[in-house]
Amino acid sequence: MTELDSLWEAIQNSFRQDTTPVTFDTLIAPAKAISLSQNQLEIEVPTPVHRDFWRKNLNTQLKEFAQRELGRNIEPHYVLEGEFTYTNKKTEDDPTPSFEMDTPLNPHYNFGTFVVGEGNKMAHAAAFAVAESPGSLYNPLFIYGGVGLGKTHLMEAIGNHMLQVNPNSRVKYVTSEDFTNDYINAIRNNTTEQLREEYRNLDLLLIDDIQFLANKEGTQLEFFNTFNALHDRKKQIVMTSDRIPNEIPELQDRLVSRFRWGLTVEITPPDLETRIAILRSKVEEDHIDIGNDTLNYIAGQIDTNIRELEGALTKVQAFANLSGERITPSLASQALKGLHRVAKNEISIATIQKQVADFYNITQGDILGKKRVKQIVMPRQIAMYLSRELTDSSLPKIGNEFGGKDHTTVLHAIDKIETELKKDTDLQNDITKLKAKLRS
């Protein structure tokens, strides 16, 4: 086996263990190693989407892995199938071929610019599978989660990918409010047949914030018939919502039933590693000079959603520009100070105790009590940790709120959770979800 074959086999095996089967099969396995020189690994990928995904999500891991395996620095170089980099002078920085769009999709919302993490990897894999084979795998695809977590990005990425593969595809992106207005205007102008012609002959319908169809009986009926017409013709439907179908109030049972025909996937708030990766991607894209220590600090302060995370980065940039100072963790702390004082004051220790108890299916009395069973001790320690993180309370104050416990008990709980967070991804996700609930 050659050095190239050995390296590539090891790389593929490593990525296979670290990603979901769908992500590996659709985005990683199709790539091929073409050549290996002293300091460059040339990798062939089938589409620009694959190329962008490797660059954004796998590049750093690949270089670190190659360094360990070969003992030298290797720079990955990505080429499209049939693209000969040295004879036709194309480079990996060539722009993605343009395509015509007759639908208002944001071209920035593509799979290459989507940062994959623990909280969104299933949704990302499902979205890419749908984009590769619309109408056949998961139809409909229903993506749900909180505000600012990337649902619209993934939805529009499906549309952009489909138009890139086939510019003649009939793709339509609308919010549920747009659909409602189209329906009302069609009734008012006696153009319902034109409306149905427009919507029921699509190849892909993307409808955002479907929960706002609640309480609109006429619109729900029209969408029900549109859904059936598209699904019967094996045309893809993708929807987003802030909750699962059966939790949308006043949504007709027949719609709930049809929304469940395909696949429902959740996007949760990004964990710390994903937040750092999102910030790093943003500063690289915007050519901003910010050190990793500062990015790590910002990512540690904002754990609600991506919009607030990028907003915090913008605030730090503005603070630096106005003050004329270099961006450092200290400056970032000053820039974000007011933001977190407001957030902390809105959350009480009692609220934290109740949310943690509900999350782990125990009682608030268990949190305040003295039982030492693991199922109660860990949630109690988490509640103490969050009380320190999300309020301005002192250790003695927190101890008093937890049934009169000593401040050293609180300190031990905080240290315990901080230690576990460094190695326990399940705990990281639990903490992220709890913080999101408490701040929502």
UniProtKB/Swiss-Prot annotation:
CDD domains: AAA, Bac_DnaA_C. Residues 72-103 are annotated as: Domain II. Residues 104-320 are annotated as: Domain III, AAA+ region. PROSITE patterns: DNAA. One of its GO terms (molecular function) is ATP hydrolysis activity. Its main location: cytoplasm. InterPro entries: AAA+_ATPase, Chromosome_initiator_DnaA, Chromosome_initiator_DnaA-like, Chromosome_initiator_DnaA_CS, DnaA_C, DnaA_dom, DnaA_N_dom, DnaA_N_sf. The keyword ATP-binding applies. Signal peptide: none annotated. Residues 1-72 are annotated as: Domain I, interacts with DnaA modulators. Residues 321-440 are annotated as: Domain IV, binds dsDNA. ATP binds at residues 148, 150-152. GO terms for cellular component: cytoplasm; plasma membrane. SUPFAM superfamilies: P-loop containing nucleoside triphosphate hydrolases (SSF52540), TrpR-like (SSF48295). It comes from the Bacteria. Keywords: ATP-binding, Cytoplasm, DNA replication, DNA-binding, Lipid-binding, Nucleotide-binding. GO terms for biological process: DNA replication initiation; regulation of DNA replication. It is found in: Cytoplasm. Belongs to the DnaA family. Domain I is involved in oligomerization and binding regulators, domain II is flexibile and of varying length in different bacteria, domain III forms the AAA+ region, while domain IV binds dsDNA. NCBIfam families: DnaA (TIGR00362). Oligomerizes as a right-handed, spiral filament on DNA at oriC. Plays an essential role in the initiation and regulation of chromosomal replication. ATP-DnaA binds to the origin of replication (oriC) to initiate formation of the DNA replication initiation complex once per cell cycle. Binds the DnaA box (a 9 base pair repeat at the origin) and separates the double-stranded (ds)DNA. Forms a right-handed helical filament on oriC DNA; dsDNA binds to the exterior of the filament while single-stranded (ss)DNA is stabiized in the filament's interior. This is Chromosomal replication initiator protein DnaA. It comes from Limosilactobacillus reuteri (strain DSM 20016) (Lactobacillus reuteri). The lineage of its organism: Bacteria, Bacillati, Bacillota, Bacilli, Lactobacillales. The gene is dnaA.
